[in-house]
């Protein structure tokens, strides 16, 4: 009986707690209306930018995608990185969002699968289902939040 309980506990620990989310939301004193998403050509998660744009749109914030050279013309920018891992098929394993205004960071969000998800079958969920809650926490103080 003790072995069975030990095995069940080990499985529960392997599956639970696999995702880590850290968010420093944008202050309520900052109202965002338009944000430039600085394109990161190193990111190969094909649906990441569309998910990001949808998330900002949910909070009534317009976005445009710009290259690094065009970012200086923007008042507020968001930079991002996203990594994928493989286990039978690719999945999002890490992402970071940083919001900037006048060279100062005004928000930060990180999604991370600890141990690349281990046995957690949720690791194969889509980018949208993983990032929507993270974006919503980041922008919780904004119009749509």
Predicted regions span which residues?
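A short, hydrophobic beta-strand-centered structural micro-motif
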Residues: 65-84, 90, 96
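Structural recognition of the beta-strand scaffold that forms the well-ordered cores
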Residues: 36, 65, 107-108
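Amphipathic beta-strand/beta-sheet edge segments enriched in Tyr/Trp
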Residues: 89-115
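Envelope-exposed proteins and targeting segments
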Residues: 33, 59, 76, 93-95, ...
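Solvent-exposed, acidic/flexible segments
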Residues: 41-49, 88-90, 120-131
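C-terminal/domain-edge helix-coil "capping" segments
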Residues: 19-28, 53-57, 108, 112-145
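A structural "domain/chain start" motif
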Residues: 2-10, 14-62, 143-145
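Active-site-proximal beta-strand/loop segments in catalytic clefts of secreted hydrolases
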Residues: 40, 68, 81, 111-112
